[in-house]
Swiss-Prot record:
Residues 1-8, 89-93, 147-161, 237-244, 292-302 are cytoplasmic. Pfam families: COX15-CtaA. Catalyzes the conversion of heme O to heme A by two successive hydroxylations of the methyl group at C8. The first hydroxylation forms heme I, the second hydroxylation results in an unstable dihydroxymethyl group, which spontaneously dehydrates, resulting in the formyl group of heme A. Pathway: Porphyrin-containing compound metabolism; heme A biosynthesis; heme A from heme O: step 1/1. The N-half (TM1-TM4) and C-half (TM5-TM8) domains are connected by an intracellular loop. Each domain is formed from four-helix bundles and they align in a pseudo twofold symmetry manner. The N-half domain is the substrate-heme O binding domain and the C-half domain is the cofactor heme B binding domain. The cysteines of disulfide bond Cys-37 and Cys-44 may be involved in transfer of reducing equivalents from quinol in the membrane to the active site of the enzyme. The keyword Membrane applies. Its EC number is 1.17.99.9. GO terms for biological process: heme A biosynthetic process. Residues 30-67, 115-125, 183-215, 266-270 are extracellular. It comes from Staphylococcus epidermidis (strain ATCC 35984 / DSM 28319 / BCRC 17069 / CCUG 31568 / BM 3577 / RP62A). This is Heme A synthase. The keyword Transmembrane helix applies.
Length: 302
């Protein structure tokens, strides 16, 4: 059960399931299914499987089920990795982070159901789950020895790119928080047309300010990732890890901007909204990988 040959497919399975956890959370919020099980947790409306199953209840139940399965699969992956490749420096910290943040994510979700948390607190839920996803994603990359294939294990990232990338991580995380806040405060259609309502630019209420803040952070994110991408391609053109990684990040942020704009234009089409959540999930995963590479560079300097 915990054999080394299970690591690759377990890593892929865990990454896929964690992706569905992210999408499930976005689906719950976008469809207003947060109260699909009332204030009961882990039960649903006081029962394991309630007799009355409207679509909101089905969505909330499905999200809880996928989250429970993800915890089992991630635990399986963590135990197997710890046992067989625990000698790799990053495996144990990533294992602790992935399980720890998955549990915190579940507790925040439960608290939201039972006590109806403030939306500014609920917005942290998505960011917490992204950290858990990224830890699983990184373990999977390590398991597949992606570092050796793309010479990342001998990559040295110089200080300018490290600074740009750390700032990129902070900016993206703040943008993720404002995006989650848009969902939880139901501000998706606030502040008028995209990119800005030129005939009425000044926000008028809290919903407008939340949406305005997210659009502003999204613009800063796009510009900063573009600057970082240009620097990386210009100075590391001979390294495939940097070239492919930062190119993928730039493509993902472009897709993120497009789906964000389309969400407003289409009055929050559900499919577009889910793609919006998907692209930011994998963008954050890529940034987490860059951080891993930078930490290795820092260690090599000591």
């Amino acid at each position: 059960m915990f054999r080394k040959q299970n690591l690759k497919w377990l890593g892929v399975l865990a990454t896929i399931i964690m992706t569905f956890v992210q999408l499930g959370g976005a689906l719950v919020t976008k469809t207003g299914s947060e109260d699909g099980c009332g204030s009961s947790w882990p039960l649903c409306n006081g029962a394991l499987l309630p007799e009355n199953l409207p679509i909101q209840t089905i969505i909330e139940l499905s999200h809880r089920a996928v989250s429970a399965i993800s915890l089992i699969v991630v635990l399986w992956l963590v135990i197997t990795a710890w046992k067989n490749i625990g000698y790799i420096k990053e495996i144990k910290p990533l294992s602790i982070i992935s399980v720890g943040f998955l549990l915190v994510q579940a507790l925040v979700g439960a608290a939201a159901v039972i006590w109806q948390q403030n939306p500014y607190v609920l917005a942290l839920h998505f960011g917490i789950s992204l950290i858990s996803f990224s830890s699983v994603f990184l373990m999977t990359l390590i398991i597949f020895s992606i570092d050796k294939k793309y010479e990342a294990d001998i990559l040295f990232i110089h200080k300018p790119l490290r600074i740009l990338t750390w700032l990129m991580a902070i900016i993206v995380y703040l943008t993720i928080y404002t995006g989650a806040l848009v969902r939880h405060t139901k501000s998706s259609l606030a502040y008028g047309a995209w990119p800005i309502p030129f005939d009425d630019i000044v926000p008028h209420n809290a919903h407008d300010w939340v949406q305005f803040s997210h659009r502003g952070m999204a613009l800063i994110t796009f510009i900063w990732i573009m600057i970082t991408f240009i620097h990386a391609i210009k100075n590391y053109s001979d390294n495939r890890t940097v070239r492919y990684g930062y190119t993928a990040s730039f493509i993902l942020v472009i897709l993120q901007v497009i789906t964000g704009a389309l969400s407003v234009i289409t009055n929050v089409n559900l499919i577009i909204a889910l793609f919006h959540a998907l692209f930011i999930t994998y963008l954050f995963g890529m940034i987490a990988y860059f951080i891993l590479l930078m930490l290795r560079t820092t260690r090599s300097q000591k």
